[in-house]
């Protein structure tokens, strides 16, 4: 069963953080119960096999709240972290313009019933090169002012490259080898940001070597979520070869003049060499209510290969640009578009 600790705040923010980190470090199985509102000065650094039960208590940090520093480019480098509950926020009312929870090279991660506040320029949760992650019944909400051109997401699903993960690059260049995420599930969540949820891709130029088939995310599931984008897409899944988005309310408030940023739900391969176009790679978008600008749902490949199977079924989809622009699927090997309601918004 491991050790169980009931944490009591012991003084100032730095002392609280040090004491919690002493309880959380190491690989043995442990449960930390946070039974009070607490103030910390910077990130908590849990070890493997850690459960944090924060209930309805508020954890306020002068920086971010959860981070791990990987020592090897392996999904199993950090494992078995569960966070239950908690209202996690920065001490500034406009939130942290950075990442609140950054988890990298990790597997078997579970974040449940947590509320995370972050500035529009930041990320509530950033998953870099992770496998087998569940984010369930969480609220991720941006704070402060959102610029008209902000494209940062509250939930970021990332690969490890020098530009996508500069924090890892500072730790070790070996950590930035382009490892993608796989088996990521987001369910029963409410997410609002400049972007809501984004699966990221590496930039052009020097980063082109991270735009290969091996760098593509896979098995991303978004289910029963309410996701809103204020100045970019509500959901944008780039370089993701297999995904399921179902039973979600997806709304982009971005004006249609922002073109592709105003799409409600976007799935796109970016320029580069993509995975082989096989019907086994399925993009399934079903039973969602989607509101967008230029398009509601937009699926396409700008890469060397087509997408695999694309299913768009049972959705109610609106586009500010008109009914005929509600759903657009381009460049897929097999396409099934059925039983959708489309309208002008």
Predicted regions and their residues:
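Polar/charged side chains located within well-ordered beta-strands of beta-rich proteins
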Residues: 16, 33, 53, 68, ...
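Glycine-rich beta-solenoid repeat tracts in large extracellular/virion proteins
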Residues: 42-46, 60-77, 95-105, 123-129, ...
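Acidic Gly/Asp/Thr-rich repetitive segments characteristic of extracellular carbohydrate-active
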Residues: 5-33
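N-terminal extracellular ligand-recognition/capping segment immediately after the signal peptide
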Residues: 21, 28-70, 88-92, 114-116, ...
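Leucine-rich solenoid repeat scaffolds
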Residues: 309, 313-345
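Leucine-rich repeat
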Residues: 77-79, 108, 219-221
């Amino acid at each position: 069963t491991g050790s169980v600790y009931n944490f009591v705040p012991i003084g100032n923010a730095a002392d609280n953080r040090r004491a919690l980190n002493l309880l959380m470090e190491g690989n043995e199985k442990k449960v930390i119960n946070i039974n009070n509102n607490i103030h910390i000065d910077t990130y908590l650094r849990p070890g493997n096999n850690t459960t944090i039960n924060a209930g309805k208590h508020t954890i306020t940090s002068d920086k971010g709240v959860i981070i791990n520093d990987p020592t090897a480019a392996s999904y199993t480098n950090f494992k078995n972290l569960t966070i239950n509950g908690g209202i996690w926020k920065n001490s500034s009312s406009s939130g942290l313009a950075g990442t609140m929870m950054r988890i990298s090279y990790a597997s078997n991660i579970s974040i449940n019933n947590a509320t995370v506040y972050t500035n529009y320029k930041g990320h509530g949760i950033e998953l870099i090169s992770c496998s087998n992650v569940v984010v369930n019944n969480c609220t991720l909400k941006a704070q402060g002012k959102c610029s008209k051109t902000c494209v940062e997401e509250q939930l970021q699903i990332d690969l490890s490259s020098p530009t996508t993960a500069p924090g890892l690059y500072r730790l070790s260049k070996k950590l930035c080898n382009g490892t993608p995420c796989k088996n990521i599930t987001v369910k029963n969540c409410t997410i609002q940001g400049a972007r809501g949820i984004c699966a990221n891709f590496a930039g052009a130029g020097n980063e082109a070597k991270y735009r290969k088939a091996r760098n593509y995310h896979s098995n991303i599931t978004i289910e029963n979520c309410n996701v809103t984008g204020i100045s970019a897409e509500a959901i944008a899944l780039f370089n993701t070869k297999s995904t399921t988005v179902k039973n979600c309310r997806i709304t982009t408030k971005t004006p249609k003049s922002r073109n592709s940023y105003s799409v409600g739900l976007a799935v796109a391969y970016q320029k580069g060499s993509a995975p082989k176009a096989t019907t086994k790679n399925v993009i399934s978008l079903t039973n969602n209510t989607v509101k967008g600008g230029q398009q509601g749902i937009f699926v396409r490949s700008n890469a060397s290969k087509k997408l695999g199977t694309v299913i768009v079924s049972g959705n109610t989809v609106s586009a500010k640009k008109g009914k005929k622009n509600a759903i657009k699927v381009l460049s897929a090997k097999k396409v099934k578009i059925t039983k959708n309601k489309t309208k002008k918004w």
